[in-house]
Amino acid sequence: MSKSESLYAQAKQLIPGGVNSPVRAFTGVGGVPLFIERADGAYLFDVDGKAYIDYVGSWGPMVLGHNHPAIRQAVIEAVERGLSFGAPTEMEVKMAELVTNLVPTMDMVRMVNSGTEATMSAIRLARGFTGRDKIIKFEGCYHGHADCLLVKAGSGALTLGQPNSPGVPADFAKHTLTCTYNDLASVREAFEQYPRDIACIIVEPVAGNMNCVPPLPEFLPGLRALCDKFGALLIIDEVMTGFRVALAGAQDYYNVIPDLTCLGKIIGGGMPVGAFGGRRDVMDALAPTGPVYQAGTLSGNPIAMAAGFACLTEVAQVGIHETLTELTNLLADGLLDAAKAENIPLVVNHVGGMFGLFFTDAPTVTCYQDVMNCDVERFKRFFHLMLEEGVYLAPSAFEAGFMSVAHSKEDIQKTVDAARRCFAKL
């Protein structure tokens, strides 16, 4: 029995499912999850001593690679001054200034502790600001585990939402309308049915929780236009895409202006941080200046702020995103060539430092239904074959992959060579 197997057996007796976040349990691919001892650069090292080229990157934050020296040093120095004060610090101000400078649509920003907190708070703020209750989300998009967001689509885009997790009252979910990603007609129909009831649209500008599905050219501008027409706010969830697709996020890459933006992952440099911000008049409705309540004991804590400030300072350096895109393109092209050589039907979606692999005969993958039509069983086999080769992909056919600037061209070539051998076995 490997040490990972032993630890997993022990963990299942102490932690529900043996993990503290479900996807880590390898439920989507089968088998025993890796228990990690350390990480450095583009590599993970498990408790059994095996190294892996890592394309999960802690689910997105590690855009600079693991254990980056500038972030590590910033955390060490912050720890020496104290872990948490429950009072304002200078670093919170510096961090807010940096974020609002990097993301011009954010006039003001409020720090929280996770992406879920960011989206939950932004939706509450949108409801409070507009005086409306209903929200629109999209099938296949994930915005954290707040009750109003754990909703699946019904028989049509306008079906009142039903919860897809026990413990979420139907009365909560009924205010969530689920539309089809990349389908403006479904959104337009929702607004026409509830013209004065919808507070906001919340959307992933690149859907990264049904693998990686970029928006069609007309989709995000169309959402902006519909929000303007019907008096709703547009919330862009950049928890995954922020500072990764482009320095100012996917909103800059796709040239769309949101009312509110949610951030996470990279903003913490590996520490638990989230943030939301946007128009000054909307943010002024937030307590203590306004009536919409939001709070957090550890929000803006000095360790997380130090890590995030160091990370964003590095990410803002000239050339980072060009390198990230070049490496991702190199990987995508190499995987497509390797799959073609072995007659394996494969679509690779990618933008900036995000990518997704789809085993499908379809020419494109642009929505949730396209994703669901892909060959999940083939992905499972591919995942485990790649794991044996020392390449760690996301352990789910419905999660995006992430590149870092710590990955070398040699790492990419090793990955492509491994994939070619694995494709030959499929």
Curated annotation (Swiss-Prot):
Which Pfam family, giving just one, matches this sequence?
Aminotran_3
CDD domains xrefs: OAT_like
- One GO term of the biological process aspect: protoporphyrinogen IX biosynthetic process
Q: Which domain of life is it from?
A: Bacteria
- What's in the keyword line of the UniProt record? Cytoplasm, Isomerase, Porphyrin biosynthesis, Pyridoxal phosphate
Look up keyword Protein transport and say if it applies: no
Q: Which SUPFAM superfamilies match?
A: PLP-dependent transferases
EC number(s) per entry: 5.4.3.8
Quote the Gene3D superfamilies the UniProt record gives: Aspartate Aminotransferase, domain 1, Type I PLP-dependent aspartate aminotransferase-like (Major domain)
Q: What is its main location?
A: cytoplasm
Q: In which pathway does it act?
A: Porphyrin-containing compound metabolism; protoporphyrin-IX biosynthesis; 5-aminolevulinate from L-glutamyl-tRNA(Glu): step 2/2
Entry GO CC:
cytoplasm
User: Which cofactor(s) are needed, names only?
Assistant: pyridoxal 5'-phosphate
Enumerate the GO terms in the molecular function aspect: glutamate-1-semialdehyde 2,1-aminomutase activity; pyridoxal phosphate binding; transaminase activity
Listed under subunit, the entry gives: Homodimer.
Concerning its family, UniProt says: Belongs to the class-III pyridoxal-phosphate-dependent aminotransferase family. HemL subfamily.
Protein name (database record):
Glutamate-1-semialdehyde 2,1-aminomutase
- Natural source organism: Yersinia enterocolitica serotype O:8 / biotype 1B (strain NCTC 13174 / 8081)
Gene name of the record: hemL
